[in-house]
From Swiss-Prot:
Name of the coding gene: Trit1
Region (Disordered): 432-467
Gene3D superfamilies: 1.10.20.140, Classic Zinc Finger, P-loop containing nucleotide triphosphate hydrolases
GO cellular component, one term: nucleus
Descriptive protein name: tRNA dimethylallyltransferase
PANTHER family per record: TRNA DIMETHYLALLYLTRANSFERASE
Zinc finger (Matrin-type): 395-425
One example of a Gene Ontology biological process annotation: mitochondrial tRNA modification
Function: Catalyzes the transfer of a dimethylallyl group onto the adenine at position 37 of both cytosolic and mitochondrial tRNAs, leading to the formation of N6-(dimethylallyl)adenosine (i6A37). Mediates modification of a limited subset of tRNAs: tRNA(Ser)(AGA), tRNA(Ser)(CGA), tRNA(Ser)(UGA), as well as partial modification of the selenocysteine tRNA(Ser)(UCA). TRIT1 is therefore required for selenoprotein expression.
GO MF assignments: ATP binding; tRNA dimethylallyltransferase activity; zinc ion binding
Chain residue ranges for the region called Core aggregation region: 221-230
InterPro entries associated with the record: Dimethylallyltransferase, IPP_transferase_euk, IPT, P-loop_NTPase, Znf_C2H2_jaz, Znf_C2H2_sf
Length: 467
């Protein structure tokens, strides 16, 4: 294969900061259902590369259908890594564990003069490989020698109490996190407890590194080639509905039943099932929970209704997840602030009948340009970063008794029906109070029209200050 030979035989020349030119780290982004695995396999075969999966659920053994793993036959066509190697009962596998193993694999692939192709839908896993953004903490051990994930332990506590403790040890980070965001609050507390250094201080140090930016440290590998597969939302929604139907036809229910019998029955009998950690957070478990736990214990009609309910829920949550993935790409890749932001090349995948000319050939041309040290002829996707917008600003709405994090969210809240309803209610109360005292005073301070105007003016000022 000429392409594979070209990929391995990269000549030495001046390149990134005077270093030898390096092979690219190919990264394929995209929502579920866009064909990321297909493109990765095609590029891997043509370029002699190896595929590194970046999917937080595919690391676990089992549930091959619901986690949409590539088949055993496809894995034989091109070397795949980071699939089916964690015991399903492990609930403490983290992005740090993933990063440590995956970066070592990538460095080994580079050392063998091959191209690593990172592909998957867990975008924060991909971020951990592209940028130096994670903080490594030391796991704690119990007296029995059992390793304990402190973050998981903290998440069992009350969210407001956790946030109060974080405010005492790291007020800067606490001001950026909502008390309901228990995972992030617990993570920040874990960092402080296990290192003695506040989470915000760690982030300041990362930002101060050469190449660092507001979202973390510098690039980990010097020559990333990022491809983003995207499709028309209506087309993708239809495709995802069909994917669920195909998964059902492939044996999804039997896979869930078997896994449920082996791993989850004991937890359910003890009322300790956990759909927040490990493989049990896979899309599909929660949606079919009621169907699986009542199967054989209710009438066929009821069971069939629960099955239909689970199928519809699975389709809806899959489509919501695809939207979330695209938002992450736009916010964390396309409009990422800072100096170490590589270009992202978009590939339109709405019409699969034109895959060869619209996706595969352009992708090959882009990667080959990186291999040869040339700038691709394709134009990268760009989105402007709004420097004035603070996504972690703290706002307290006394009217609604709510904490809002982020300028955009605050502006949206001020325009929301719930806030406007509370504002209207407050105005009525103010006017009623004025009317009650009106007979006792003719002071202009008690003029209802003036109070109404001031209330409207105050709300308008809030909007102007927040938009």
């Amino acid at each position: 294969m000429a392409a594979a030979a070209a990929a391995r035989a990269v000549p030495v020349s001046s390149g990134f900061r005077g270093l030898r030119r390096t092979l690219p780290l190919v990264v394929i982004l995209g929502a579920t259902g866009t064909g990321k695995s297909t493109l990765a396999l095609q590029l891997g075969q043509r370029l002699g590369g190896e595929i590194v999966s970046a999917d937080s659920m595919q690391v676990y053994e089992g549930l091959d259908i619901i986690t949409n793993k590539v088949s055993a036959q496809e894995q034989k066509m091109c070397q795949h890594h980071m699939i089916s190697f964690v015991d399903p009962l492990v609930t403490s596998y983290t992005v740090v564990d993933f990063r440590n193993k995956a970066t070592a694999l990538i460095e080994d692939i580079f050392a063998r003069d091959k191209i690593p192709i990172v592909v998957g839908g867990t975008n924060y896993y991909i971020e951990s490989l592209l940028w130096k953004v994670l903080i490594t903490t030391k796991p704690q051990e119990m007296g029995t020698g059992k390793v304990v994930d402190r973050k998981v332990e903290l998440e069992k506590e009350d969210g407001h109490e956790l946030h109060k403790r974080l405010s005492q040890v790291d007020p800067e980070m606490a001001a950026k996190l909502h008390p309901h965001d228990k995972r992030k609050v617990a993570r920040s507390l874990q960092v402080f407890e296990e290192t003695g250094i506040s989470h915000s201080e760690f982030l300041h140090r990362q930002h101060a590194e050469e190449g660092g930016g507001p979202l973390g440290g510098p690039l980990r590998f010097p020559n990333p080639c990022i491809l983003w597969l995207h499709a028309d939302q209506a087309v993708l929604d239809e495709r995802l509905d069909k994917r669920v139907d195909d998964m059902l036809a492939a044996g999804l229910l039997e896979e869930l039943r078997g896994f449920h019998r082996r791993y989850n029955l004991k937890n359910i009998s003890e009322n300790s099932q956990d759909y927040q950690h490990g493989i049990f957070q896979s899309i599909g478990f929660k949606e079919f929970h009621e169907y699986l736990t009542t199967e054989g214990k209710c009438t066929p009609e009821t069971s069939n209704q629960l099955l239909k309910k689970g199928i519809e829920a699975l389709k809806q949550v899959t489509k919501r997840y695809a939207r979330k993935q695209n938002r992450w790409v736009k916010n964390r890749f396309l409009s990422r602030p800072g100096p170490s932001v590589p270009p992202v090349y978009g590939l339109e995948v709405s019409d699969v009948s034109k895959w060869e000319e619209s996706v595969l050939e352009p992708a090959l041309n882009i990667v080959q340009s990186f291999i040869q040290g040339h700038k691709p002829t394709a134009m990268p996707v760009k989105m402007a970063y709004n420097e004035s917008e603070n996504k972690r600003s703290y706002h307290m709405c006394d009217l609604c008794d709510r904490i809002i994090i982020g300028d955009r969210e605050w502006a949206a809240h001020l325009k929301s029906k719930s806030h406007l309803h509370q504002l209207k209610k407050r105005r009525r109360l103010d006017l009623d109070a004025v009317s009650a005292t009106g007979s006792q005073s003719n002071s202009p301070d008690c003029d209802p029209e003036r109070i109404e105007g001031e209330s409207s003016g105050q709300h308008n000022q809030e909007l102007k200050a927040s938009v």
